[in-house]
Amino acid sequence: MRERIEALIRDYQKNKMELKCLEHQIRNFRGISENEMIDTMYFTQPEGERVQTSGVSDKTAKIAMSYRERMDAMNEEWYQHLEKQYFALAEEISFFESAVKALPGKMGEIMQDMIFSQASWDELADKHFVGRTTIWRYRQKAIDERVVLYEKHEAEMTAYMLS
């Protein structure tokens, strides 16, 4: 669990950027076009036994009859995949942010500046009038406290899912 929290701290800005990218993809979703779908269907090789009955016209007829349904299904699947990723990442970021903001006193202020503002350790030391060792101790203590919180959160989610 400790490694997970350290990864969340380290990757916070990357995760926020990924969330914005997913939001942009969802807002501007266009899906696969009709021409792309027809090309995909036309140039794929059939699976299973190969018995050719009437050549190209049979394949063309099948494509003409089913391309729209397959295109809509693929687009819907992809859109749902993007939404699922977005909501999972948004929930993870939201819980992480609230967990960091819940840290008490100077430790909370330092961790918020470290994570959300991406302040360097020297900037943190100057701003909060503490040494680098104190910042390191605050960071370790904050991670330890968040481990307990995340373990409790995970246990609650597991209990809910099993009930």
Feature names for model-found ranges:
Residues 118-134:
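Helix-turn-helix DNA-binding module
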Residues 129-149:
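DNA-recognition helix of helix-turn-helix
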Residues 1-99, 148-163:
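N-terminal interaction/assembly modules
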Residues 102-119:
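Short amphipathic alpha helix immediately N-terminal
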Residues 5-8, 104, 128:
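A broadly tuned, weak detector of single residues within folded domains
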